[in-house]
Amino acid sequence: MKLICSIYKSPRKDGMYLYVDKRDALKRVPEGLLAAFGAPQLAFELVLTPERQLAREDINKVLANIEAQGYHLQMPPAEDEYIEHLPEELLRMNDPM
């Protein structure tokens, strides 16, 4: 199976991507998912084959999901619980003026 895939990134959540068949674009993606995802921003396009390696996803799962439901949703990697998120103003305290 060979598929030209459009990959969209979410403006709402870093690391969240939506893989779709380029021919169908976003037609098969449920409205509720699009509403939660935000306005999709085209990140890039790839030719997907079972032999291709993806950085964070199983290629066979991606291809199966696109064929069965019209899309594959890549969730952001889980953050470690011990990481504390600091306010932006604290992160800039040592920046030169």
From Swiss-Prot:
Annotated InterPro entries: YcgL-like_sf, YcgL_dom
Alphabetized Gene3D superfamilies for the sequence: YcgL domain
The protein, known as: YcgL domain-containing protein PST_1364
Disulfide bridge map: none
YcgL domain location: 3-87
Pfam families listed in its UniProt record: YcgL (PF05166)
Superkingdom, taxonomy of origin: Bacteria
